[in-house]
Design a protein with these regions (language model features):
Chain B
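Conserved N-terminal structural module of periplasmic/extracytoplasmic solute-binding proteins
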Residues: 2-13, 26-122, 139-140, 366, ...
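C-terminal capping/gating helix-and-loop segments adjacent to ligand/active sites or protein-protein/ligand interfaces
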Residues: 239-240, 371-380, 390-444
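Extracytoplasmic/periplasmic substrate-recognition and gating elements
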Residues: 264, 305-370
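Short helix-initiation/N-cap motifs at beta->coil->alpha
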Residues: 88-97, 189-196, 270-284
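Hinge/lid segment of periplasmic solute-binding proteins
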Residues: 116-171, 222
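Extracytoplasmic/periplasmic solute-binding protein
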Residues: 158-166, 171, 195-244
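Glycine-centered hinge/linker elements that transmit conformational signals in sensory
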Residues: 240-271
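A local structural motif
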Residues: 77-89, 107, 183-186, 260-273, ...
Length: 293, 447
């Protein structure tokens, strides 16, 4: 065993196929895109060096700044709600339902496996008005109110999008955090209970600090996933009304493929990557500070 | 320590190399034309390919069917010399796919393309890939098969005869004769008459005019037609040439008219998220009294399963005039379908023969088989045309002057912006002045 893993040549030969594939498919395109962001044009028209002009354009382009705001807003709100809801559910599984939690866990997890476009179309028809009115408006009418055209306003579309994201992913975070909560030794909970800590106090002073690592991983994971949201917002209302719910990914797609500007599209991609890095590092830093204290 | 810094050095070198690769692409980028002029005006000057590859949109199965029918029928000889081969693309992916294929030198012989791409200053045309159909057909003596109205529309939109007019559509207001008669309404001749009619219809509990707001363009059509009636048929050409601005009062009046019409609820509930099929169905099942649409709606009107109000009950009228405006009611809005170009580099003699054969026979083939009105002459008899189709054909035959649509001469970014922002305009979230100001800013920046 040691003689195999000790020999560097063997390690290299074993790793090489996967490493080469990974480099070609992941690293090279990322580097290429980084390079493209300093050019302007497309594969048909040819590329022209523009230096940092694309980046300065980005920060003065109202459509780009609006899309950045949409991405950040969606990421923060969705993350907070997803992780909080998931954590609440995990606590439910561990402390209230205990052994009987398997069935509930499965049902709540189920929406995660559904394709995001299908879920978006489902929620789109939930809030529909007019011809095929959806249940949301039927309920409003039942209580005597007038039908609301939810998808005609930014607030309505965003709320529906977040509700949709919560519904489909809270089960996932619940299961993830449940695994983390199971790691907490029973004895610590027992002794805390003996000391008089119950309910909320128990959660706040014992459970949360002990599950902090997995909580932080979930937050980072969720932030990265929601910053890159694309199909949910596109399938729900096409990034509308107007472009008020169009995230950076959608703007990048339109720039590169509908307006055939590969250079500027690459710039948007680079800035999005940088944004993900910033958020991740910020969480890491704050967690390290907590540990030191 | 040594190995870690070595590894880091290799990683940095790798990424730097990858970042420099585009420079190599840049050096070889841009298709250098070696045949055909860069204006696409050389006509037939290319070399014949091995097969007549045709790329059409998924959403348009009719074109594929009719060309196949021609290859087995009237154009059998041309097909034997150069066999037909079909490719498909989703209409929304057209620009992406065509740009990619063109840059690889794999552009099909006859393909759908994007409007901005084929104009003289567009990427495809500048690379010498767009064939001049007029020159080619005149050379073969078959130019007379293209209807003058269609040729004029194509030249207006694309800046040259670059597209085969497989469809020729005029636009106007389809209306339910019975509903209008029941409410004592006659064909409105002016915009104010139309608004009054809509008011009466709304009171009668019927949706006055249904439009597919989810697509954006059905609403900008109405605004555009108001502007053409108010300012005159050259309204949008003036904006493109910089002689007028969208923020001028006569243009803003169009946006305001649309906003007011929507605000009064004349489009019905939930119109801003209503899709095309739902909207057509609302008209064809009698829930809506009118709809502004194009003659492509004929396929639904002629379909007894979709048309519940009956073909004889469907009337067609042009968009009304505007009081004090310079446009007239007989300037129909016309378009010639999605652009279908011939690859200039492959425009050899066999391809010219194929295209000539299509020009001679497509008119009759499409009308007989699918009830589609094209921009080609109908050479031969057609049986069983529905009355609605015949009525539209008659109107087309009598057309002197056509107007284009609102976004026709805009660049692709402004085109997109016009559609996305119209939802905000019609739901009261954006004022008419703001809408036009934003659109004008986009045209100034990108046009």
């Amino acid at each position: 065993m040691n003689s195999i893993f000790g020999d560097r040549k063997t390690i290299f030969i074993l790793l090489a196929p996967a490493l080469v594939l990974y480099t070609l498919l992941k690293v090279v395109p990322v580097g290429w895109s980084l390079g493209l962001s300093f050019f302007e044009g497309n594969s048909l028209r040819g590329f022209e060096w523009v230096g940092l002009q694309n980046f300065t354009t980005f920060f003065t382009d109202p459509a780009a700044l609006q899309s950045m705001w949409v991405s950040v807003f969606f990421a923060i709100v969705a993350t907070i709600c997803q992780v909080a809801l998931g954590y609440g559910l995990a606590l439910l599984y561990v402390f209230v339902l205990r052994k009987g939690s398997t069935l509930v866990r499965t049902f709540v997890f189920f929406p995660t496996v559904l394709p995001t476009v299908a879920v978006a179309l489902l929620f789109r028809s939930f809030v529909a008005v007019g011809e095929n009115q959806g249940p949301v408006n039927d309920i409003i009418n039942f209580f005597g109110g007038e039908s609301v055209e939810v998808l005609a306003s930014t607030v309505g579309t965003m709320t529906t999008a977040i509700a949709m994201t919560l519904w489909s992913s809270m089960g996932f975070y619940a299961v993830l955090l449940y695994a983390g909560l199971l790691d907490i030794p029973e004895e610590i909970i027992e002794s805390a209970r003996l000391d008089g800590a119950n309910g909320f106090k128990l959660v706040r002073h014992i459970v949360v600090p002990l599950s902090l690592p997995i909580l932080l991983s979930s937050i980072i994971f969720s932030l990265n996933a929601t910053l890159k949201v694309f199909d949910s917002l596109l399938a729900l209302n096409g990034g509308g009304p107007g472009t008020s719910t169009a995230p950076m990914t959608l703007y990048m797609y339109r720039t590169a493929f509908e307006y055939a500007e590969y250079g500027y599209g690459s710039t948007i991609a680079v800035i999005l990557t940088a944004l993900c890095l910033v958020f991740t590092l910020a969480i890491f830093r704050s967690s390290r500070r907590k540990a030191e204290v | 320590m040594n190995t870690r810094s070595n590894r880091r050095r290799i990683a940095v070198l790798g990424i730097a190399l990858a970042a420099v690769l585009p420079l190599a692409a840049c050096a070889g980028g841009g298709a250098e034309p070696d045949t055909g002029s860069s204006e696409g005006g050389a006509g037939a000057g290319g070399t014949d390919p091995d097969t007549f590859t045709v790329m059409t949109a998924n959403e348009n199965p009719v074109l594929e069917e009719q060309l196949t029918a021609l290859s087995e029928g009237a154009c059998k000889a041309e097909n034997e010399a150069l066999p037909l081969e079909h490719q498909k693309v989703a209409q929304a992916d057209t620009v992406q796919k065509v740009t990619l294929l063109a840059s690889q030198g794999a552009l099909p012989t006859h393909t759908i393309a994007g409007t901005a791409l084929i104009r003289p200053d567009g990427d495809l045309n500048a690379a010498g890939l767009v064939g001049d159909l007029k020159a080619a057909l005149e050379g073969a003596g078959t130019w007379g098969n293209v209807l003058p109205a269609a040729a004029s529309t194509v030249e207006q939109v694309y800046g040259g005869m670059f597209s085969m007019p497989y469809q020729y559509n005029i636009e106007g207001i389809f209306y339910n004769k019975e509903i209008l008669a029941d409410n004592g309404i006659e064909e409105p001749q002016t915009w104010d008459d139309l608004v009054d009619a809509a008011d009466t219809l709304a009171d009668a509990g019927v949706v006055p005019m249904t439009e597919a707001g989810a697509n954006g363009w059905p609403l900008t059509r109405i605004m555009g037609m108001y502007i053409f009636r108010n300012v005159g048929p050259d309204a949008m050409a003036a904006v493109r040439d910089g002689d007028a601005k969208l923020t001028d009062p006569e243009y803003v009046a169009g946006a305001q008219a649309l906003a007011d019409f929507a605000d009064a609820g004349y489009f019905g509930e939930g119109f801003s998220t209503r899709d095309g099929d739902t909207s057509s169905n609302m008209f064809l099942t009698g829930q809506a009294a009118m709809t502004y649409d194009g003659s492509w709606l004929l396929s639904a009107i002629n379909d007894p399963e979709r048309n519940e109000i009956g073909g004889e009950n469907v009337g067609f009228m042009p968009f009304p005039e505007v009081d004090g405006g310079k446009g007239s009611i007989d300037q129909y809005a016309a378009n010639a379908g999605a652009p279908m170009i011939i690859n200039a580099e492959q425009f050899g003699p066999k391809v010219v023969d194929w295209v000539s054969c299509i020009a001679e026979n497509y008119g009759q083939q499409a009308l007989q088989d699918a009830g589609v009105i094209s921009g080609f002459k109908v050479n031969g008899d057609v049986t069983d045309i529905s009355e609605n189709t015949a009525e539209i054909q008659e109107r087309i035959a009598g057309i002197d002057e056509t107007v284009l649509w609102f976004e026709a001469l805009m660049d692709s970014k402004s085109n997109s912006l016009a559609s996305t922002n119209v939802t905000l305009l019609t739901t009261g979230q954006m004022s008419a002045e703001d809408y036009m100001a934003q659109l004008q800013a986009s045209i100034d920046a990108n046009g």
